[in-house]
Amino acid sequence: MLDTLKNLIKKLPFDFTKNQAYDTQTNAIIKRVCKKNSNCLDIGCHKGEVLDVIVHHAPDGHHFGFEPIPSMYKTLVTKYANTNCTIHEVALSNTSGVSVFNHVVSNPAYSGLEKRAYDKPNEVDEQIEVKTEKLDILFDKKTPIDLIKIDVEGGELNVLEGAIETIKRTKPVIIFEHGLGASEFYDSSPEKVFALFTSLNYNISLMKSWLDDKSSFTLDEFKNQFYEKRNYYFIAYPK
């Protein structure tokens, strides 16, 4: 029933929910940024919905998906078996090793290295072990990257900290989630995220603002987005 409702909402001629608006904006950014041979990373690949869009707009590139939940990883490997996509069964972070991972069985999209707040009272979760790795260690130093999408339920700062050299080298456009209810469980904050991107000479904007060529956020503006729960999906891009 829930999947049927979601499919009906997707067919509406307007954005019914904030998540649907984010999806529309993400698709528009991918279309604008990617050339046919662009290479992209989907960190927190889940079912591959964003990766599908990437493959459509960059059919000649080499793309990489990262998904630590074993069952979802296996599904992705099968789905992309005969494509130009490589799927890694790993949780990207700022450390290398093995870590406990909170798998939300009833709502896998809420899963992460730390247990986040839930919107519903009866979510069912379990603790599993997953491999963690820094993108800087895992990724080929010679491959150019045009776009990175990060949706890891609060762990985005850790992912970014483990990808500093890759970002410096390739200067990709980065679409990322950062919201109250998840990010604070990783000792993350908009101040820390803003400082990291500033050190990389990056701006942060709403996706819609970037698409409309509007100005980027100041620190105070970005903080207000987070603490007042105005938005939780953003784009970072080189100045």
Language model features: what each stretch is:
Residues 1-239:
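Phosphate/nucleotide-binding beta-alpha loop and adjacent structural elements of enzyme active sites
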